[in-house]
Structure formats: structure tokens, C-alpha cells
Amino acid sequence: MKKLLILASTLMLMVLSCGNSGSESKSSGNAGTGSKKYRIGITQIVSHPALDSAREGFKAAFKEAGVNAEFDEKNANGETTNSNLIANNFVSSKEDLIFAIATNAAQSASQATNDIPVVFAAITDPQSAGILKNNVTGVSDRMDVKQQLELLKKIAPNTKNVGVIYNSSEQNSKIQVEDLKKAAKELGLNIVEKSVVQANEIPQAVDNLVREADAIYLPTDNLVASVVSLITEKATAAKKIVFGAEAAHVKGGALITQGVSYYEIGKEAGKMAIEILKNGKKPSEIKFKTMPLSEIEVNEKTLAALGISLPEDVKSKAKMIQ
């Protein structure tokens, strides 16, 4: 029976490696010959542009620093059971470090080991996620949402009702909505919430928001990220502004963001990992951090479709995306 369980676990991990967005399960960072090669397990809860960018940013940090590393990349395809299996396998194979992308992946890694260093990325509130231990640190994607709302008011000063769509079963999203409501109250704005738990609920929720809100905010939510284009197409057709929490939303058709860069989040997490592996720092000596807001990004096609003009002080700072 034990042999069968081991075989089943091995087969499952082979499947998870194959489903890694077309990338191979193992890749190497560039470094000088003869240098120590670190073995790093990368666990990602699901594949979408933001989380994929964090993964690539993490690997880029090693390449830029000339640190030799072999990355064993696994994707849980949205399943916590898979995430637990991946984390336990990394512990069994005695990886030098685990990089965990998003809350579920980090929770699995944190629970699986007290000894192997774990560096996380793309978690809004690591404290409430229960992952902070002596062997865990990383980079949060929590941001100053008030600054996002102030940007919205600059480009659409008559905005009164701001809609938000989010997955109510995702703790990160609920925290972001609470932050949004607090900031909106300070700015005299009203928040219209639509929560969903499955992707097939989103079209109806967006239709309702388009009727009830003047603009729509997209948080960093894994479910929302999977259907950004659907949301932005419906909103743009109704001449409603969509502003996003991160750059991938703008690439998916949202008008504007001044959010976080997941590539830079991943790169910062990579720098932390290098401090731990190469320079001997303990994770407990590196406090988890948040990142400053990135540059303003605007979708040029959406701007034209909405028929609006940006104020000069916004336009002069904005990076236009085709």
C-alpha cells in the first residue's frame, strides 16, 4: 500500500510539472563556473500573468546577481491539495529554499517545514494568513489603495460610486475590499460590492456593476485575474472606467493603474532569497516588506474607446500601453 501511495504522489507531481504554463519544471540561473548551485523549489498556486511575472522576477534576481541556481517549478493548478503535495515533496527532496507564490502556496510551504527557508510573494496580509514563522519572510502585494482612488478622481472627478468585484472566499481580496472601503470613505466615495466564488458568476456581477457604478476597481484577486478581458470589455462597452491594482489588468483592457509590479515583487523576493542562501542571513532577520506603487500605466486603446482625455499632470507621468 505504501509503495502505491508513493507512486501516486510521484505521478501527481509529474502532472503538476507538465501543467506549468508551458515552462519546463526545472531551469537554471546563469552564474560563473564552479560556484555552488542552489536548489530552489518554486510553488505557484495558479498560473495567470501577475503570478507568472512574480516567478520570472524572482529568477531574474538570481541571473542578475550571478548566483547559480536550479529552479524546480511546480503549479498547483488552483488546488490546495496539490499545493500541500508540492510543498511536502520539496521538503522531502531537501531543497535549499522554497519560493511560494500566493497565499495558499505559502501556507502549504509554511506548514510543511520549520527548517527550510521559505520566501513568499503576492500575499496581501501574511500576518492574517498565518504564515509568519522564523523560517519565513517575503514580499507582500498590499498597496496604498487611497492613492489609486485619488488617481481615479483626477481623471473622472464626477465619480461617486465605485464598483468592486472580488472572490469572497479569497482572504487577500476581502482585506483589499476593506482597505478600499476605508479609503473611499475618506474621499467621499461610495463602494458598490459584488462578490463571487466562481468564474461563471462574474458576467452577471459585472452587468450589475455597470448599471450601479460609475467606475470599477479590480483588486489583485486570482479569480478576477482569470477573466480580466471579459470584465473590461463589458465595462468599456458601457463607457465605464476600469482601474486595476496592477499592470496585468491594464494589459487586459483596464484603463489605468498605479498599482504594484509583480515582476518587481518577485525580484525583491529573489534578492531576499540570495541574502539567505549566499550571505547566510536567517529569514527571521529579514522583515517582510511591501513595495512602493509603480508608475502610472494607461491602455491607449481603452482610452480611445472611452473617449476621455487625461489631465496633463497624469498624462505626463503615464506609460502608454498598446
Predicted regions mapped to residue ranges:
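Sec-dependent signal peptide recognition
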Residues: 2-8
